[in-house]
Each structure stands twice: as C-alpha cells, then as structure tokens.
Amino acid sequence: MSFKMKRTLEMRRVESAFADYLENEDSIDLLWSDKVGYVFLTINEKTHESESCDDLHTATQLCHRLLDDMAITVLLQTKRNHNFTNMDKDEAARVRAAWKPVIEKLPDYAYLCDEILREAQENEEENGIDLQ
C-alpha cells in the first residue's frame, strides 16, 4: 500500500498568501508531490539548476520556510554581504515590512515572524548585535 500526502486547505491557503512572492522570485520554486508534500527548491539563477530542496509536510513548516526565504531575499537586496543572523535593526524593519502583506492574509502565523527574528537575535547576542 502506498502512502499519499494530502495537500490540506490550510496548506493551499499558505501557498496562496505567498503567490506574488513565489511568482516574482527567480531563485526559488515550490512544487507539490503526493509522495513527500511540498518541495521547496532553491535555484541557481546563473545555471538554472536546483541547489537544494526541503520537504515541507505541514502548513506551519511551509509558512516558516517561505517567511525565512523572504527575509534572506531582503538581506540580499541590501548588498551588505552577510547572512540572516547578522542583520541590524534597519534590516529587521525591512524584513517585517516585506512580511506584512503575507501576514495580513495569514494573521494566525504572525508568531512565526517573531520566532524567526528571535532565533536570529539569539544567534547574534553572542556577537553583540541588538535587533530590538
């Protein structure tokens, strides 16, 4: 007997909230597989080959992964050559602004934004950076 993942209405709602972002971002793609659920691909924009993939089985995992990617995209736009855990207060504000249209559609997932920034802050407290 084979196992089939079910794409729930909640998963579809999350995917729909990120539709504009997914359509406009060339370095990622989101696919559905009945065998593993959502597959989040990162794509090399120069070679057009996949670089990595994540299997996402729940709406919460999907939302967290997409919010995290949006934050990374904002940081790449600042051209300061650092990763997500090194962002400053201004960058954190830009990330929140980017998240706002999505969270307005998914207010029950707003806690993930705080969780992502808190994780970044906890990683950076060791290095003396304050994101508050």
Regions found by a protein language model. Give the residues of each.
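Acidic, low-complexity, intrinsically disordered interaction modules
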Residues: 31-114
